[in-house]
Amino acid sequence: MSDKLTIAGREFASRLIVGTGKYRSFQEMQRCHEASGADMVTVAVRRVNLTDRTKESLIDYIDRSKIFILPNTAGCYTADDAVRTAMLGREVGLSNWVKLEVIGDEKTLFPDNAGLLEATRILVKEGFAVLPYTNDDIVNARRLIEAGAAAVMPLAAPIGSGLGIQNPTNLRIFREMITEVPVIVDAGVGTASDAAIAMELGADGVLMNTAIAAAEDAVKMARAMKLGVECGRLAFESGRMAKKLYASASSPLTGVVGA
Protein backbone atom coordinates (compact mmCIF):
# COMPACT_ATOMS: atom_id res chain seq x y z
CA MET A 1 0.00 0.00 0.00
CA SER A 2 1.20 3.49 -0.77
CA ASP A 3 0.28 5.13 2.54
CA LYS A 4 1.72 3.98 5.83
CA LEU A 5 0.29 3.31 9.26
CA THR A 6 2.06 5.40 11.89
CA ILE A 7 1.89 4.48 15.58
CA ALA A 8 3.97 6.20 18.26
CA GLY A 9 6.20 7.65 15.55
CA ARG A 10 6.93 4.31 13.91
CA GLU A 11 5.80 3.63 10.33
CA PHE A 12 4.38 0.35 9.07
CA ALA A 13 3.89 -0.45 5.40
CA SER A 14 0.90 -2.70 6.08
CA ARG A 15 -2.31 -1.76 7.87
CA LEU A 16 -2.93 -5.41 8.72
CA ILE A 17 -1.69 -6.76 12.05
CA VAL A 18 -1.84 -10.50 12.59
CA GLY A 19 -1.46 -12.87 15.51
CA THR A 20 0.54 -15.98 16.31
CA GLY A 21 -1.99 -18.27 18.03
CA LYS A 22 -4.14 -21.25 16.98
CA TYR A 23 -2.07 -22.21 13.95
CA ARG A 24 -1.59 -25.88 13.15
CA SER A 25 2.18 -25.44 13.23
CA PHE A 26 4.82 -22.76 13.50
CA GLN A 27 5.60 -23.33 9.84
CA GLU A 28 2.01 -22.57 8.84
CA MET A 29 2.10 -19.45 11.00
CA GLN A 30 5.23 -18.30 9.22
CA ARG A 31 3.71 -18.86 5.78
CA CYS A 32 0.59 -16.94 6.81
CA HIS A 33 2.64 -14.02 8.03
CA GLU A 34 4.38 -13.87 4.66
CA ALA A 35 1.12 -14.14 2.71
CA SER A 36 -0.54 -11.42 4.79
CA GLY A 37 2.16 -8.86 4.07
CA ALA A 38 1.97 -7.76 7.70
CA ASP A 39 5.03 -6.14 9.19
CA MET A 40 3.70 -6.29 12.76
CA VAL A 41 2.54 -9.41 14.59
CA THR A 42 1.22 -9.73 18.10
CA VAL A 43 2.57 -12.35 20.50
CA ALA A 44 1.12 -13.39 23.85
CA VAL A 45 3.89 -13.01 26.40
CA ARG A 46 2.48 -16.04 28.23
CA ARG A 47 3.14 -18.22 25.14
CA VAL A 48 6.82 -17.37 24.86
CA ASN A 49 9.28 -19.73 26.52
CA LEU A 50 11.08 -17.29 28.78
CA THR A 51 13.14 -19.77 30.78
CA ASP A 52 14.76 -22.05 28.21
CA ARG A 53 15.54 -20.33 24.92
CA THR A 54 17.24 -23.49 23.63
CA LYS A 55 13.80 -25.03 23.06
CA GLU A 56 11.74 -24.34 19.95
CA SER A 57 9.66 -21.18 20.24
CA LEU A 58 7.27 -19.31 17.99
CA ILE A 59 9.74 -16.41 18.17
CA ASP A 60 12.14 -18.55 16.14
CA TYR A 61 9.68 -18.41 13.24
CA ILE A 62 9.37 -14.63 13.11
CA ASP A 63 11.89 -12.72 11.02
CA ARG A 64 12.50 -9.77 13.33
CA SER A 65 14.45 -7.95 10.62
CA LYS A 66 11.17 -7.62 8.70
CA ILE A 67 8.44 -8.03 11.31
CA PHE A 68 7.89 -5.96 14.44
CA ILE A 69 6.75 -7.94 17.48
CA LEU A 70 3.88 -6.47 19.50
CA PRO A 71 3.66 -8.34 22.82
CA ASN A 72 0.19 -8.70 24.31
CA THR A 73 -1.16 -9.38 27.77
CA ALA A 74 -3.77 -11.96 26.75
CA GLY A 75 -5.11 -13.91 29.70
CA CYS A 76 -4.76 -11.07 32.21
CA TYR A 77 -7.81 -10.27 34.31
CA THR A 78 -6.39 -7.51 36.53
CA ALA A 79 -4.44 -4.34 35.90
CA ASP A 80 -1.60 -5.59 38.12
CA ASP A 81 -1.30 -8.84 36.20
CA ALA A 82 -1.32 -7.01 32.86
CA VAL A 83 1.38 -4.59 34.04
CA ARG A 84 3.59 -7.42 35.30
CA THR A 85 3.17 -9.31 32.03
CA ALA A 86 4.06 -6.26 29.95
CA MET A 87 7.12 -5.62 32.10
CA LEU A 88 8.21 -9.22 31.71
CA GLY A 89 7.90 -8.98 27.94
CA ARG A 90 10.14 -5.94 27.91
CA GLU A 91 12.68 -7.48 30.27
CA VAL A 92 13.21 -10.49 28.00
CA GLY A 93 13.73 -8.25 24.99
CA LEU A 94 10.41 -8.50 23.16
CA SER A 95 9.46 -4.81 23.06
CA ASN A 96 8.54 -1.72 25.06
CA TRP A 97 5.27 -1.75 23.12
CA VAL A 98 2.26 -3.66 24.37
CA LYS A 99 -1.15 -4.62 23.10
CA LEU A 100 -2.83 -4.20 26.45
CA GLU A 101 -5.60 -6.61 27.39
CA VAL A 102 -7.35 -6.56 30.76
CA ILE A 103 -10.26 -8.96 30.49
CA GLY A 104 -13.39 -8.34 32.55
CA ASP A 105 -15.55 -11.33 31.65
CA GLU A 106 -14.39 -14.89 31.02
CA LYS A 107 -17.24 -15.90 28.70
CA THR A 108 -17.33 -12.87 26.40
CA LEU A 109 -13.69 -11.77 26.88
CA PHE A 110 -14.94 -8.19 26.96
CA PRO A 111 -12.43 -5.73 28.45
CA ASP A 112 -12.48 -4.42 32.01
CA ASN A 113 -12.57 -0.69 31.28
CA ALA A 114 -11.52 0.42 34.76
CA GLY A 115 -8.62 -2.02 34.90
CA LEU A 116 -7.60 -1.16 31.34
CA LEU A 117 -7.42 2.53 32.14
CA GLU A 118 -5.42 1.91 35.31
CA ALA A 119 -2.91 -0.31 33.52
CA THR A 120 -2.59 2.16 30.64
CA ARG A 121 -1.68 4.99 33.02
CA ILE A 122 0.93 2.87 34.77
CA LEU A 123 2.57 1.51 31.62
CA VAL A 124 2.69 4.89 29.87
CA LYS A 125 4.56 6.26 32.90
CA GLU A 126 6.93 3.30 32.60
CA GLY A 127 7.78 4.26 29.02
CA PHE A 128 5.58 1.84 27.09
CA ALA A 129 3.76 2.51 23.85
CA VAL A 130 0.35 1.20 24.90
CA LEU A 131 -2.25 -0.09 22.43
CA PRO A 132 -5.31 -1.01 24.53
CA TYR A 133 -7.93 -3.53 23.41
CA THR A 134 -11.18 -1.82 24.33
CA ASN A 135 -14.89 -1.84 23.58
CA ASP A 136 -16.49 0.49 21.05
CA ASP A 137 -17.30 3.13 23.67
CA ILE A 138 -16.05 6.54 22.53
CA VAL A 139 -16.08 7.92 26.09
CA ASN A 140 -13.80 5.19 27.37
CA ALA A 141 -11.57 5.56 24.31
CA ARG A 142 -11.16 9.26 25.11
CA ARG A 143 -10.04 8.40 28.63
CA LEU A 144 -7.47 5.96 27.30
CA ILE A 145 -6.10 8.59 24.93
CA GLU A 146 -5.91 11.13 27.76
CA ALA A 147 -3.96 8.51 29.73
CA GLY A 148 -1.41 8.36 26.91
CA ALA A 149 -2.50 5.43 24.73
CA ALA A 150 -0.61 5.32 21.41
CA ALA A 151 -3.67 3.89 19.64
CA VAL A 152 -7.11 2.59 20.54
CA MET A 153 -8.27 -0.85 19.47
CA PRO A 154 -12.06 -1.21 19.62
CA LEU A 155 -13.55 -4.65 19.15
CA ALA A 156 -15.81 -5.36 16.18
CA ALA A 157 -17.32 -8.41 17.90
CA PRO A 158 -16.22 -10.82 20.67
CA ILE A 159 -12.69 -12.21 20.35
CA GLY A 160 -12.57 -15.28 18.13
CA SER A 161 -16.27 -15.10 17.24
CA GLY A 162 -15.88 -14.31 13.54
CA LEU A 163 -19.15 -12.37 13.67
CA GLY A 164 -17.82 -9.43 11.70
CA ILE A 165 -18.59 -5.75 12.22
CA GLN A 166 -21.52 -5.72 14.64
CA ASN A 167 -21.73 -1.99 15.32
CA PRO A 168 -20.62 -0.01 12.27
CA THR A 169 -22.19 3.17 13.62
CA ASN A 170 -19.88 3.25 16.63
CA LEU A 171 -16.82 2.58 14.48
CA ARG A 172 -17.84 5.43 12.21
CA ILE A 173 -18.14 7.67 15.28
CA PHE A 174 -14.65 6.59 16.36
CA ARG A 175 -13.31 7.66 12.97
CA GLU A 176 -14.98 11.06 13.11
CA MET A 177 -14.13 11.87 16.72
CA ILE A 178 -10.68 10.35 17.20
CA THR A 179 -7.90 11.93 15.18
CA GLU A 180 -5.05 12.08 17.72
CA VAL A 181 -4.12 8.40 17.52
CA PRO A 182 -4.83 5.50 15.15
CA VAL A 183 -8.04 3.49 15.47
CA ILE A 184 -7.35 -0.20 14.91
CA VAL A 185 -10.25 -2.64 14.79
CA ASP A 186 -9.40 -5.61 16.97
CA ALA A 187 -11.39 -8.85 17.37
CA GLY A 188 -14.40 -10.28 15.60
CA VAL A 189 -13.26 -10.24 11.96
CA GLY A 190 -14.22 -13.49 10.24
CA THR A 191 -13.43 -13.04 6.57
CA ALA A 192 -11.94 -10.59 4.09
CA SER A 193 -15.16 -8.64 3.57
CA ASP A 194 -15.22 -7.84 7.31
CA ALA A 195 -11.72 -6.42 7.06
CA ALA A 196 -12.72 -4.37 4.03
CA ILE A 197 -15.80 -2.99 5.80
CA ALA A 198 -13.73 -2.00 8.84
CA MET A 199 -11.35 -0.09 6.60
CA GLU A 200 -14.19 1.47 4.58
CA LEU A 201 -15.58 2.81 7.86
CA GLY A 202 -12.29 4.62 8.35
CA ALA A 203 -10.27 2.35 10.60
CA ASP A 204 -6.55 2.97 10.38
CA GLY A 205 -5.82 -0.73 10.62
CA VAL A 206 -7.21 -4.15 11.48
CA LEU A 207 -5.82 -6.78 13.84
CA MET A 208 -6.84 -10.41 13.52
CA ASN A 209 -5.75 -13.91 14.39
CA THR A 210 -8.46 -16.59 14.45
CA ALA A 211 -9.97 -15.53 11.13
CA ILE A 212 -6.74 -16.60 9.44
CA ALA A 213 -5.58 -19.42 11.70
CA ALA A 214 -8.97 -21.19 11.78
CA ALA A 215 -9.59 -20.99 8.03
CA GLU A 216 -9.49 -24.26 6.09
CA ASP A 217 -6.69 -22.79 3.98
CA ALA A 218 -5.02 -20.38 6.36
CA VAL A 219 -2.37 -19.18 3.91
CA LYS A 220 -4.95 -18.35 1.27
CA MET A 221 -7.08 -16.53 3.86
CA ALA A 222 -4.04 -14.51 4.94
CA ARG A 223 -3.66 -13.35 1.36
CA ALA A 224 -7.39 -12.57 1.19
CA MET A 225 -7.15 -10.47 4.35
CA LYS A 226 -4.23 -8.53 2.91
CA LEU A 227 -6.27 -7.68 -0.17
CA GLY A 228 -9.39 -6.95 1.88
CA VAL A 229 -7.59 -4.39 4.02
CA GLU A 230 -6.02 -2.75 0.97
CA CYS A 231 -9.35 -2.72 -0.88
CA GLY A 232 -11.20 -1.16 2.06
CA ARG A 233 -8.53 1.48 2.56
CA LEU A 234 -8.63 2.49 -1.10
CA ALA A 235 -12.43 2.70 -0.99
CA PHE A 236 -12.30 4.90 2.12
CA GLU A 237 -9.76 7.23 0.56
CA SER A 238 -11.74 7.37 -2.70
CA GLY A 239 -14.88 8.72 -1.04
CA ARG A 240 -17.91 6.59 -1.85
CA MET A 241 -20.89 7.95 -3.77
CA ALA A 242 -23.84 9.29 -1.80
CA LYS A 243 -26.65 6.83 -1.12
CA LYS A 244 -29.95 7.68 -2.80
CA LEU A 245 -33.48 6.40 -2.32
CA TYR A 246 -34.35 6.36 -6.02
CA ALA A 247 -32.64 5.36 -9.24
CA SER A 248 -30.30 7.64 -11.14
CA ALA A 249 -29.50 6.71 -14.74
CA SER A 250 -25.81 6.20 -15.39
CA SER A 251 -26.12 6.81 -19.13
CA PRO A 252 -27.05 10.24 -20.56
CA LEU A 253 -30.36 10.64 -22.39
CA THR A 254 -28.69 12.57 -25.22
CA GLY A 255 -29.06 10.67 -28.48
CA VAL A 256 -31.82 8.36 -27.22
CA VAL A 257 -34.48 7.83 -29.89
CA GLY A 258 -37.53 9.93 -29.06
CA ALA A 259 -35.76 11.89 -26.34
UniProtKB/Swiss-Prot annotation:
Question: How is this protein annotated for GO cellular component?
Answer: cytoplasm
What is the name attached to this protein's record? Thiazole synthase
Q: Which PANTHER family match?
A: THIAZOLE SYNTHASE
Biological processes, Gene Ontology terms: thiamine diphosphate biosynthetic process
Which gene is the coding source of this polypeptide chain? Answer: thiG
Subcellular location as annotated: Cytoplasm
Recorded GO MF terms: thiazole synthase activity
| Residues at the active site | K99
What pathway does the annotation place this protein in? Answer: Cofactor biosynthesis; thiamine diphosphate biosynthesis
